[in-house]
Design a protein with these regions (language model features):
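N-terminal auxiliary segments of SAM/dcSAM-dependent transferases
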Residues: 1-22
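Local beta-strand N-terminus motif with an aromatic residue
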Residues: 60, 106, 122-123
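A short acidic, Gly/Pro-enriched loop at the edge of an enzyme's catalytic core
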Residues: 117-125
Length: 127
């Protein structure tokens, strides 16, 4: 099945912006400067992770992010100190997640969560 079923049409632009960005953090002013429509607000907006703030994450917490998209939630979880396994069904979105999470404890894979093999379990699942 084609990856395209998951796309909203913004993926090429999102990947391009992330490739060029020096600051890919959750609170990045650099990424926020690219917000000019709904898809860019979804991928670069700071407010999206506000829903995650009640979740207590830190070192030693393992997070599974199913349908990780461009890595917004994965990035935020890793910034809190968690170890993140991110699974994304679309190759371009998975590439965006890799770029967004570079340098953090995030393992991004392109594929289906049903194919995931992990014997260590997870403390938190995001989707």
């Amino acid at each position: 099945m084609s990856d395209r079923r998951w796309r909203d049409g913004s993926e090429d632009r999102i990947v391009s912006v992330l490739r060029a960005a020096g600051d890919r953090s959750s609170a990045s002013d650099e990424l926020a400067a690219h917000i000019d429509d709904w898809p860019t607000r979804y991928h670069f907006g700071r407010a999206r992770t506000n829903l995650l703030h009640p979740i207590r994450l830190g070192p030693g917490v393992r997070v599974l992010d199913v349908g990780a998209g461009s890595g917004v939630n994965s990035r935020w979880a890793a910034e809190q100190g968690a170890t993140v396994v991110a699974v994304e069904g679309d190759a371009l979105r998975a590439e965006a997640a890799v770029l967004r999470c570079t340098g953090l404890d995030v393992d991004v894979s392109h594929g289906s969560a049903t194919d995931l093999v992990d014997n260590d379990g997870f403390d938190v699942v995001l989707c």
